[in-house]
Amino acid sequence: MPHSYPALSAEQKKELSDIALRIVAPGKGILAADESVGSMAKRLSQIGVENTEENRRLYRQVLFSADDRVKKCIGGVIFFHETLYQKDDNGVPFVRTIQDKGIVVGIKVDKGVVPLAGTDGETTTQGLDGLSERCAQYKKDGADFAKWRCVLKISERTPSALAILENANVLARYASICQQNGIVPIVEPEILPDGDHDLKRCQYVTEKVLAAVYKALSDHHVYLEGTLLKPNMVTPGHACPIKYTPEEIAMATVTALRRTVPPAVPGVTFLSGGQSEEEASLNLNAINRCPLPRPWALTFSYGRALQASALNAWRGQRDNAGAATEEFIKRAEVNGLAAQGKYEGSGEDGGAAAQSLYIANHAY
């Protein structure tokens, strides 16, 4: 039987567990504002705004200047490296702006996906080199949690056993390194919604991927109470001809989680995966109304699904900043309700909130 060499002290474990629980306190979720410079280029070009460092700062300021209404629905904000060191118009660092609201600051630490040779276009994620040193610095600079994204895709031949195993192991290495530095790792194995597969196929693949991830986390002695999971919801592929209800998506999603995610994990913060703002809220709401026991907080870690209406309202104009911030607050509040199963739906069929945010082969 393997011996246990304690990786973390009782104090370290308590700190990690406390941070994780703060982020997913009832009715709270995560704003993912960690789009890379390249991803911001796509967002800004949609509204005809040049992708400069100053414009990226101004856009992040729209989100981060939200008033105290967001305290009750946002538990954490994921920053990109550049944003972590930017300030608002008054010279106040964004990190302090967020911390002063009692919101936990997080940082994206992976360095993007790279091809896995010998596979059918599958990938792994790079960024383990120097990660411990970067985590130590980020912790000093105010970050208490981190995010690392792995990507898997569903096709006839994928995900392969190799891709599942490699990505599970890289997530576990990342998680272990974060915890050694007092940072809560968000483990993100995203199964892309590309393809014409049905709900059952996505559920099956999600179960296989999550089972591998938690096996790897155990192998690497990761302290589960000090982690969060950021999975896809179980949904059909974007090209699937069958339309499923939020209730069907919720049942498939919660069933997959119940079969694979230990109850020691404090929270599951779903990615929105290109769903429209409204769809992402309705599905999260249905998940929290699902009639199965759910031992974890089930909440959101949304990027596009919290930002699309705000971006549309802003359009790079200073005069629109206030209105854009209001749009963000509205989505944050809606998702805070959905995370408690208390959202009744907007009744809006049109408008920005109903626009699909799907991008094929999405890479940040």
Swiss-Prot record:
Phosphotyrosine: residues carrying this PTM: 5
Modified residue annotations for Phosphoserine: 36, 39, 45, 132
Any one Pfam family match given in the protein's UniProt record, by short name: Glycolytic
Entry's family note: Belongs to the class I fructose-bisphosphate aldolase family.
Site positions for Necessary for preference for fructose 1,6-bisphosphate over fructose 1-phosphate: 364
GO BP terms, alphabetized: fructose 1,6-bisphosphate metabolic process; glycolytic process
Record-listed substrate binding positions: 56, 147
Protein name: Fructose-bisphosphate aldolase C
Catalytic function, reaction form: beta-D-fructose 1,6-bisphosphate = D-glyceraldehyde 3-phosphate + dihydroxyacetone phosphate
EC number: 4.1.2.13
CDD domains assigned: FBP_aldolase_I_a
InterPro entries according to UniProt: Aldolase_I_AS, Aldolase_TIM, FBA_I
Further details from the record: In vertebrates, three forms of this ubiquitous glycolytic enzyme are found, aldolase A in muscle, aldolase B in liver and aldolase C in brain.
GO molecular function (one): fructose-bisphosphate aldolase activity
